[in-house]
């Protein structure tokens, strides 16, 4: 069974064609700068043959039409006809309270999905455009929506409720939703496989660390709490997002800097985080390089990030009533031995010791703690596309 996994952003589309009988990748690609000058598609098939196509892609429909031509290209593609694709799995950022699991999209559910856009106005609209376009271009294929928020829908009410007047929850569904759920689910379940135990029997903290970062407490195989909230803004300080902060700072800054609602939103989401603190970059590789050369603000940004992770691990260990594994994933979690060491050294009070040789790896599954620790520290590369494809296959 062939499944096409699609992730539509505001100006990009990531895609991966998978044969789910072997869970193998036939090809993967990226269409970028959609609707912007210099748009292109870059694709590589499982033979290592790379296609780079530079042409005008005015909108998502044009991009997806071109992507389907690339997928069926005689030399660089992987199939002869799109009719071979049985289902398309779409990443959808926000499912609200109405979608607590993946669903096959029909006309009725599409209306409900469109209503969710007010909860994620930057992310859900392009996700929906992707679904509608694939329905039009591949009417034979089932369209499945896999939600970033779904894995966190099992959180207990006391974990997701905010202490604002309850009527706001009833009227506007203001609550903690959490994000990166597909990654947290894949990684926690894979960690359990590596440890040789049922995920339901383990207490796991997953640290998804990248330009956007979130931490989740996984117990009984589901998310019990997570660091992101109503939006992806709270939690850890991120590439350009503030993370947790006193909300009273918002009206204070709006008054002092004469900022409107959209302007303060832009500051908190696009100009803050480690970029705002360091004044250098939102890329942690740049910060590690600058810190190694003595840049104090870069070092401060890195220390703030590590400190936030350590605090969340401590809090979630208490919330779970114990801990079996801390799992690092995402671009930073998988590749930065420096950040992993900062975090794990902060947990040395538990008796955990780092295996320096094993920690000196990038992008591989590995246990980085020495034997005898009270819990296991490990790296598990995430694979959101595979998780989306699996959930799509289950529903079709």
From Swiss-Prot:
It catalyses: acetate + ATP = acetyl phosphate + ADP. Mg(2+). Can also accept Mn(2+). The record marks 180, 241 as: Transition state stabilizer. ATP binds at residues 14, 208-212, 283-285, 331-335. GO terms for cellular component: cytoplasm. InterPro entries: Ac/propionate_kinase, Aliphatic_acid_kin_short-chain, Aliphatic_acid_kinase_CS, ATPase_NBD. Its EC number is 2.7.2.1. Pathway: Metabolic intermediate biosynthesis; acetyl-CoA biosynthesis; acetyl-CoA from acetate: step 1/2. Substrate binds at residue 91. CDD domains: ASKHA_NBD_AcK_PK. The keyword Magnesium applies. Homodimer. Belongs to the acetokinase family. Catalyzes the formation of acetyl phosphate from acetate and ATP. Can also catalyze the reverse reaction. This is Acetate kinase.
């Amino acid at each position: 069974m062939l499944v096409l996994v699609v992730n539509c952003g505001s100006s990009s589309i990531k895609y991966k064609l998978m044969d789910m009988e072997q869970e193998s990748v036939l090809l993967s690609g990226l269409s970028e700068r959609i609707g912007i000058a210099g748009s292109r598609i870059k694709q590589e098939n499982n033979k290592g043959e790379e296609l780079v196509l530079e042409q005008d892609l005015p909108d998502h429909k044009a991009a997806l039409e071109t992507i389907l031509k690339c997928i069926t290209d005689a030399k660089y593609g992987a199939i002869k006809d799109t009719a071979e694709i049985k289902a398309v799995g779409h990443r959808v950022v926000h499912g609200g309270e109405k979608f607590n699991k993946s669903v096959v999209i029909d006309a009725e559910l599409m209306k409900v999905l469109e209503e969710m856009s007010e909860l994620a106005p930057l992310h859900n609209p392009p996700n929906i455009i992707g679904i509608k376009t694939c329905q039009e271009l591949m009417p034979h294929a089932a369209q499945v929506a896999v939600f970033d928020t779904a894995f966190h829908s099992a959180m207990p009410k006391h974990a997701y409720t905010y202490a604002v007047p309850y009527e706001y929850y009833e009227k506007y569904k203001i609550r903690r939703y959490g994000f990166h759920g597909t990654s947290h689910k894949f990684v926690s379940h894979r960690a359990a496989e590596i440890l040789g135990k049922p995920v339901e029997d383990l207490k796991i903290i997953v640290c998804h660390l990248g330009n956007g970062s979130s931490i989740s407490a996984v117990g009984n195989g589901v998310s019990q709490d997570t660091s992101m909230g109503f939006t992806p803004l709270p939690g850890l300080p991120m590439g350009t997002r503030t993370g947790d902060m006193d909300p009273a700072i918002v009206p204070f800054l709006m008054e002092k800097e004469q900022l409107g609602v959209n302007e303060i939103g832009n500051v908190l989401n696009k100009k803050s985080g480690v970029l705002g603190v360091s004044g250098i970059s939102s890329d942690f590789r740049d910060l590690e390089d600058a810190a190694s050369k003595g840049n104090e603000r870069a070092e401060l940004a890195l220390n703030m990030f590590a400190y936030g992770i350590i605090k969340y691990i401590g809090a979630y260990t208490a919330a779970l009533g114990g801990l079996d594994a801390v799992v690092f994933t995402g671009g930073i979690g998988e590749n930065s031995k420096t950040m992993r060491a900062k975090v794990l050294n902060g947990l040395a009070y538990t008796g955990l010791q780092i295996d320096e040789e094993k920690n000196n790896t990038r992008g591989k599954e590995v246990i980085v703690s020495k034997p005898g620790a009270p819990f296991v520290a490990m790296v598990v590369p995430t694979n959101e596309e595979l998780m989306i494809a699996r959930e799509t296959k289950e529903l079709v």
